[in-house]
Amino acid sequence: MKQLLEFIPLILFFTVYKLYGVQQAAITLVIATVIQLIVLKVLYKKIEKSQWIMGIFAVFFGILTAYFNDLNFLKWKVTIINGLFAAVLLVSQFVFKKPIIQMLLGKELKLPTNVWNRLNLGWAGFFIICMLLNIVISYYFSDDVWATFKTFGFTGLSLIAAIATGVYLYPHLKNVENTNEQA
């Protein structure tokens, strides 16, 4: 249910954009994002930092988009968010010497350091690719193509990245289970 809630503002934005245009879609995005954050707080008592960041960016850039009737602000948001996530992942690994993914999931998953490092770098690479794809699609394709790719392309890429992560982790999780069973 939580994942579904995260997609509602995006789907509403896309639908309203196709039917009524940029300004109404941006206003819809802002309202839907605020409602989404309230519902997440009420249902789950906690809003993750990444959800706060995404929500604040969506509201801020959504307001700019609606005010100036210019989709470029939301296009910048996607680039900035992906760049920010990639930077956080890389800084955590190379500056602080502990991948943020390990900090977030280390209690649930017991994995060797090299696996955490590869996983962290893989997701950093994913966000860099998404950032670059967004720049290319923003500047070389129509707004309609961008809106469609933003809604369905990035969602599909995220799903592929999540599946690839599961496939990569599976052998390591089996090794961890075998180690636990022998103990």
UniProtKB/Swiss-Prot annotation:
It is a multi-pass membrane protein. GO terms for cellular component: plasma membrane. It comes from the Bacteria. Keywords: Cell inner membrane, Cell membrane, Membrane, Transmembrane, Transmembrane helix. The chain crosses the membrane at residues 19-39, 53-73, 76-96, 121-141, 151-171. It is found in: Cell inner membrane. InterPro entries: YciB. The keyword Ribosomal protein does not apply. Plays a role in cell envelope biogenesis, maintenance of cell envelope integrity and membrane homeostasis. HAMAP family: YciB. Belongs to the YciB family. This is Inner membrane-spanning protein YciB. It comes from Actinobacillus pleuropneumoniae serotype 5b (strain L20).
